[in-house]
Amino acid sequence: MDYMARRELSRAQLHKKLQPYAEDEDELERVLNEFAQKSWQSDERFTQAFVRSKSTKHGSARLQQELKAHGVSADLIRDALPSREEELRNAIGVARKKFKQPAQNFEEKQKQMRFLLYRGFSSGIAQAALKADWDEEEPWDSEG
């Protein structure tokens, strides 16, 4: 219980943590169902907290991959991922924090693009982020 109070866990994570202590699989499922019923554990809450904490540094592809690894359903993942505008804003912030200025040549642009792709941003979002005017306060547009 102490561990659950400190941070949200997915059902799959909790299952893995409790499995060594369970007598059998049925008992473990009963406990997990009770936790969900009492709202002590919620995959939806876990997914929202996870996306909220990581979305400013990572793109949708990476978030989706990590959430799948935590055993979260595709429906919950799809509902929790940031909008295209939010993701573009995050990609611009990540690029500016890392590189401080726009690419001066093709090699620098490739390096910046690889960095954003590694962070899980789609190629379209990464290209739009690198094309954004670095001097503007809000450098994205809604058609992005």
Language-model region placement:
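An alpha-helical, amphipathic repeat domain used for nucleic-acid recognition
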Residues: M1-G144
